Amino acid sequence: MDTPAIHNDIAWGKVNRPIAKERFDAILAKVCAYLQGREIFIFDGFAGADPKYTKKFRIVNELASQNLFIRDLLIRPTTEELAAYGEADYTVIAAPGFKCDPAIDGVHSEAAIMIDYEAHLIVICGSQYAGEIKKSVFSTMNYVLTKEGILPMHCSANMDPVTHE
C-alpha cells in the first residue's frame, strides 16, 4: 500500500503497483467477510534466525496445504516460545478463493498481494500459489530489516537432529 512514509522506498512499476489505503481497506473488508464462517488455519512462527532481528508472523489462511507449506518454511516456536508469543509483528491473511473484481477493486487481475507496512498487515487473495506467502514474508523482512541497517539473506540450511552437523 502506498503511503507518504514509504512511497520513495518502493520501486513502483509494472510489478509493484501502488494502491491507495481506501482500496486496500475495501479489499481487506471483502476478504474478511469472505473468510467468515469458513474453516481457516492459523500458524504463528518466526522469520529470521537471529533473536535480535527475528520477527513474529501470524499466518491466517483458508488452505491447509498453504498452512503446511509456511509451517515448514518459517521457524516453529517451541512450546515455551508459543506461550510467550504475544502479538505478532506482522499478520498475513491469505484467501486464495477470494477473487478481486478489477473493475471494482482497482487492481489489475483477480489476484492481489498487498502489504500495509504501517498496519503490519499483508493481504493475499486470488492466488493458490503458496509461494506468495513466503515472498510476502521475505519482502517484509527485506524492507523492515534494511530500515534497521541489516542486510537480510534469503537462504536456508539443514541440520541433522542427532549429530547437529
Residue ranges of model-derived segments:
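A noncatalytic interaction/capping subdomain that flanks phosphate/NTP-handling catalytic cores
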Residues: M1-H164
